[in-house]
């Protein structure tokens, strides 16, 4: 829509996959659909991040967000250390490859801490989104480690 200016596609893989998290913050994301990112694996410390891993896959939801909304979202204290990178994801429904941004923690921050509550919430969400059962278990395992 005109009034928001430029839009970006973002591959969300953490709790922001829940659109209501974003709409409660006053954002207006347009859901494009579930997708998979090859060559990365999920890691849950204090929050979720993706780490490069040749043989792995991470699942998420692609949404379109106004650039200014994305900037506002990632300027919040809990997520402002995340850095955007350019990725190509595959939409699960069509197999179409699309370019998107993905926000990850820098490697030196990625492994800090462990939040079993976050892991539990994210595994519940991943299950509700009907992601691969093995992937749901991979997320849930982070909750059992802490």
Model segments located where?
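Glycine-aromatic micro-motifs
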Residues: 4-146
């Amino acid at each position: 829509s005109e009034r928001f200016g430029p839009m970006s596609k973002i591959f969300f893989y953490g709790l922001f996959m829940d659109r209501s998290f974003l709409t409660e913050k006053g954002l207006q994301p347009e859901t494009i659909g579930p997708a998979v990112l090859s060559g990365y694996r999920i890691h849950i410390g204090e929050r979720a991040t993706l780490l490069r891993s040749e043989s792995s896959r991470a699942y998420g939801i692609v949404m379109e967000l106004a650039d200014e909304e994305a900037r506002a979202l990632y300027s919040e204290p809990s997520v402002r250390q995340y850095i955007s990178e350019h990725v190509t994801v595959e939409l699960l429904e069509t197999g179409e490859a699309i370019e998107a941004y993905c926000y990850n923690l820098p490697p030196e921050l990625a492994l800090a801490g462990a939040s079993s509550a976050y892991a539990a919430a994210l595994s519940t969400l991943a299950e509700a989104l009907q992601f691969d059962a093995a992937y749901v278990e991979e997320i849930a395992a982070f909750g059992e480690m802490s």
